[in-house]
């Protein structure tokens, strides 16, 4: 392990001028330098914070950030020791963008991709997961406590008994599924999340954020800034399904969606506390997704932007829907969309008779009937406060009454 100047002889003399004599002694001893890196972890620093501190003491170009992160995370989860061989890919080091001259989010796209899912603050669990060769398949964040405090630099300080942030990580292999669930203060919850995301090309099935508790609404900006900071510093996340639930504005939802890989993202679940859709529907992540789930109060705004989805789900939780809205959905989505295969209205305070009438159902229809539009047919079924619409096969004589499976 050496300073960056040794890789570029033309600039080695300039780099050396900025390194204190004592620092040069450390940089020439691999074990001493690794000890300094390990010390940052033992003091509770996150990778970027530890890197910046060592830049101040050892010089701004003592090591590429991605190379530092390789050793920081390896020493933290005990997959590396002070005497381990340095197997960091040298070509990756050369490809990385220098820090701190450039924003860390840019460098995260080129850091070494590994299979190590290290967790600052829970190294033993991480080490077990690594050895067993599991893959992270889902990350679920639940914010339940509103007693949060931040300084101007968003250091994720906590006050009182702030232990209401839950980080749940799902691991899958061919034989079984394991869920690791930890309840942290916000500070350590964000460190835990960062450790799972940082420097790894994860392919997630689910990334879910749930805001629970009525008091959490007053701290929207605080947890939003915390999570936004982590996602921003770790670059693009690959996930098949993204779900943002409760006490979230459409602006915050749009900002979060930007961090997920468009084209790879298939399913989106949104439950915002406002009905503004402009920031969301213009995103490629939204345009390329195939399934959408919406919370109450958003249907009337979104129905003009949903004709490209294959699966739709609307959860109204007792909120009334006018007959006019049903007819607009019938004429603008059911009749026109060539992609729609299934749709579910859940917890809808709308009588079965009115729903059937809106779709011109025969008077004799009770519970289930077939609706035809533009040479296509749909089976519409009512079940209590739920209504299911499923596209039938092209052979109308073989229509079967069936329920669309929920995609969430």
Swiss-Prot record:
The gene is fbxa-155. Residues 1-22 are annotated as: Disordered. InterPro entries: DUF38/FTH_CAE_spp (IPR002900), Mos1_HTH (IPR041426). Pfam families: FTH, HTH_48. This is F-box A protein 155. Belongs to the FTH family.
């Amino acid at each position: 392990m050496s300073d960056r100047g040794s890789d570029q002889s033309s600039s080695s003399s300039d780099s050396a001028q900025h390194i204190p004599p004592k620092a040069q002694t450390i940089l020439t001893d691999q074990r001493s330098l690794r000890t300094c890196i390990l010390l940052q972890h033992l003091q509770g620093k996150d990778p970027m914070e530890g890197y910046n501190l060592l830049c101040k003491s050892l010089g701004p170009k003592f090591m590429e950030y991605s190379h530092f992160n390789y050793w920081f995370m390896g020493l933290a989860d005990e997959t590396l020791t002070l005497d381990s061989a340095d197997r960091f890919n040298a070509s990756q080091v050369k490809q990385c963008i220098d820090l701190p001259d450039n924003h860390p989010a840019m460098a995260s796209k080129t850091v070494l991709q590994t299979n190590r899912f290290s967790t600052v603050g829970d190294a033993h669990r991480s080490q077990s997961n690594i050895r067993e060769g599991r893959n992270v398949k889902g990350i679920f964040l639940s914010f339940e406590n509103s007693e949060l405090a931040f300084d101007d630099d968003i250091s994720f300080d906590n006050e009182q008994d702030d232990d209401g942030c839950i980080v749940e990580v799902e691991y899958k292999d061919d034989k079984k599924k394991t869920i690791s669930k930890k309840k942290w203060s916000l500070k350590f919850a964000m460190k835990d999340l960062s450790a799972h995301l940082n420097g790894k090309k994860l392919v997630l099935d689910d990334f879910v954020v749930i805001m629970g508790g009525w008091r959490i609404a007053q701290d929207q900006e605080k947890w939003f800034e915390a999570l936004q900071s982590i996602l921003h510093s770790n670059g693009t996340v690959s996930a098949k399904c993204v779900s943002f639930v409760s006490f979230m504005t459409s602006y915050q939802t749009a900002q979060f969606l930007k961090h997920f890989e468009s084209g790879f993202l298939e399913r989106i679940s949104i439950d915002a506390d406002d009905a503004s859709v402009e920031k969301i529907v213009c995103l490629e992540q939204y345009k390329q997704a195939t399934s959408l789930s919406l919370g109450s109060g958003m249907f009337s705004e979104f129905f003009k932007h949903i004709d490209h989805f294959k699966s739709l789900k609307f959860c109204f939780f007792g909120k009334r829907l006018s007959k006019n809205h049903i007819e607009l959905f019938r004429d603008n989505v059911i009749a026109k969309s060539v992609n729609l295969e299934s749709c579910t209205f859940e917890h809808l305070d709308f009588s079965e008779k009115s729903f059937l009438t809106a779709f011109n159902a025969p008077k004799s229809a009770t519970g289930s009937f077939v609706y035809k539009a533009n040479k296509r047919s749909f089976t519409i079924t009512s079940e209590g406060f739920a209504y299911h619409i499923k596209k039938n096969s092209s052979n109308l004589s073989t229509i079967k009454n069936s329920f669309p499976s929920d995609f969430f």
